[in-house]
Amino acid sequence: MHSFQEFYNVYKSPAGNTGESYSDFTRTVASPQQTNDTIAPKKNSECLIVIPAYTNRISEFEQMNLKNNVERLGKCFDICIVCPKLLRADVYNSIASGVELQYLRLPSRNFIGKNSYSNMLLSADFYKHFTAWKYILILQLDVYIFG
């Protein structure tokens, strides 16, 4: 398994055969210096669970997954919701009930479609927010953790 820092070092380099550099994608992602949200390790863990969220209206299925996953993972790992600036935290906090969630609010343009979301995930600036952890797990809301 590679550490997050190894991953970051690889992906901050040019994008290979596309002819684009990852700096081309950073126009859509706020760097840690440009956002007011500060996320920091709170638990004694090397791994951060990152949950992308883009709407205040999450389906019953997504609510069930979020509740289950934060109950299972929130005891041991820090959890961060990556979301647009205008997302209401109370929607997610009420589902997480008792598990502290951190929020990283990024420009809404990163969440308007598959291309902008993919570009955000390809951006080195996105991963700069998480350098305090050795590993990150990006956990989509359609995932249900068993065990």
Positions of predicted regions on the chain:
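N-proximal low-complexity "stem/linker" segments adjacent to membrane-targeting elements
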Residues: 2-67
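Short beta-strand-to-loop acidic/aromatic patch adjacent to the donor-nucleotide binding site
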Residues: 133-144
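Catalytic core of nucleotide-activated saccharide and alditol-phosphate transferases
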Residues: 11-14, 102, 147
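Short catalytic/ligand-binding loop motif for oxyanion handling, primarily in non-cytosolic enzymes
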Residues: 58-61, 87-91, 144-147
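Active-site-proximal specificity loops/subdomain of glycosyltransferases
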Residues: 82-134
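Short, acidic, metal-binding catalytic loop of nucleotide-sugar glycosyltransferases
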Residues: 64-77
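Short coil/turn segments at beta-strand junctions that form active-site/ligand-binding loops
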Residues: 45, 77, 133-135
